[in-house]
Amino acid sequence: MACGLVASNLNLKPGECLRVRGEVAADAKSFLLNLGKDDNNLCLHFNPRFNAHGDVNTIVCNSKDAGAWGAEQRESAFPFQPGSVVEVCISFNQTDLTIKLPDGYEFKFPNRLNLEAINYLSAGGDFKIKCVAFE
């Protein structure tokens, strides 16, 4: 999957929120947001799939520790529409990441890497980032 934006040295601390707004492609199959220490150490791989890898209208989350993927977690809540502008807010603490979807629904994903700061963000797939904000 082609990578769009890559940012490093973010220094996002526990309790702070990363707000990502972007446009989902009209013919979207999937997109992703990766957060962590670097490309091989991700506390969150956030992958909404419209129709990809055998999943339809499902959010797949995972982590990557020293290049090794963990166990996938699937969310059936799927407020994304092709051709729409969406906003996702992600915050974290020592135990969990909290992902707030465009419709206000929130779910948690374990902070398996126990990161104390998030320094890396990448985005890819059928998603064009319009705005990244820290709160």
UniProtKB/Swiss-Prot annotation:
InterPro entries, per database record: ConA-like_dom_sf, Galectin-like, Galectin_CRD
**Residues modified as N6-succinyllysine:** 108
Q: Domain Galectin: where?
A: 4-135
Using the record's annotations, give every residue carrying the modification N-acetylalanine.
2
**Effect after changing residue 69 to F:** Reduced carbohydrate binding
What coarse category fits the chief subcellular location reported for this protein?
Answer: secreted
Q: Which residues carry this modification: Phosphoserine?
A: 30
Listed A to Z, the keywords are: Acetylation, Apoptosis, Cytoplasm, Extracellular matrix, Lectin, Phosphoprotein, Secreted
Cellular component annotations (GO), alphabetically ordered: cytoplasm; extracellular space
Query: Localized where?
Result: Secreted, Extracellular space, Extracellular matrix; Cytoplasm; Secreted
Q: Which domain of life is it from?
A: Eukaryota
Family matches, as CDD domains: GLECT
Q: Where does the record place the modification N6-acetyllysine?
A: 13, 29, 108, 128
Q: Which Gene3D superfamilies match?
A: 2.60.120.200
Report if keyword Plastid is assigned: no
* GO terms under biological process: apoptotic process
What is the annotated quaternary arrangement, including any partners? Answer: Homodimer. Binds LGALS3BP. Interacts with CD2, CD3, CD4, CD6, CD7, CD43, ALCAM and CD45. Interacts with laminin (via poly-N-acetyllactosamine). Interacts with SUSD2. Interacts with cargo receptor TMED10; the interaction mediates the translocation from the cytoplasm into the ERGIC (endoplasmic reticulum-Golgi intermediate compartment) and thereby secretion.
Function description:
Lectin that binds beta-galactoside and a wide array of complex carbohydrates. Plays a role in regulating apoptosis, cell proliferation and cell differentiation. Inhibits CD45 protein phosphatase activity and therefore the dephosphorylation of Lyn kinase. Strong inducer of T-cell apoptosis.
Q: Which PANTHER family match?
A: GALECTIN (PTHR11346), GALECTIN-1 (PTHR11346:SF97)
Spell out the protein name for this chain: Galectin-1
